[in-house]
Amino acid sequence: MFKVKCKLGRFAGHVDKFPCHFGYKIGDEFYYDGVEFSGRICPGLFASMMPIIHGTFLLGYKYTENIMFRYRGLDVKDPDMAKYDGAGYRPAYEVPGGLPEEFKQMGPPPPPNERAKTSHFTCGDTRILAEFTCEAVDLSDSDYAQPFYRRAISILEKIEAQPGINVDDILNKFTDFEKNEISPRLSPVLLEVLMEALVDMKYVEVREGKAYATGREPPSRPKIGQSEE
């Protein structure tokens, strides 16, 4: 589970002619950690933002990076190409002329060697269309996310204690009690999912099957096994 940042990237409509009644400015941000929002949130965003934030909170980068359409780039219709692609499109390498200015403001697709990490949503005011990016920026240590957060931190601490540990050996560093009696059970597949989260959030690097901590400090370090006072 992830801490989510939403940031106003642009107004896709005509904010020069119609005001944003919430007073948003480019660069304004708000956050969600699974329990609380922080920052100013216009009610005109609720309908569009909740599915995006929910998916990003649960899946992090995985919410967007495997959407194949994100890597398609620009196309133009070309029926002669149907014998190749089955649909009749041809890649375009620049924005066609004669389009409204807002189309020219659209950023290019991610480079072919980078996976998409952000999603987006817009406000309900079609005159201004405030467009926010949405991305996972950290593991969530909110109380709702604690069971999974603690599992992730326990894995990180095993890697910190033994830099260069083989990824396949990490699970064996936990006792039977630690693996099977603490919820959620630390199964091989859960460890794999948590490792991906640690890598995505830049806590861990994996090189040639070996894991190394990056030195990034997590938002908190729970004292696992000790009662809270």
Could you describe each region identified by the protein language model?
Residues F37-S48:
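Short, Lys/Arg- and Gly-enriched loop/turn segments at beta-strand edges
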Residues G164-S183:
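Short acidic, hydrophobic short linear motifs in intrinsically disordered regions
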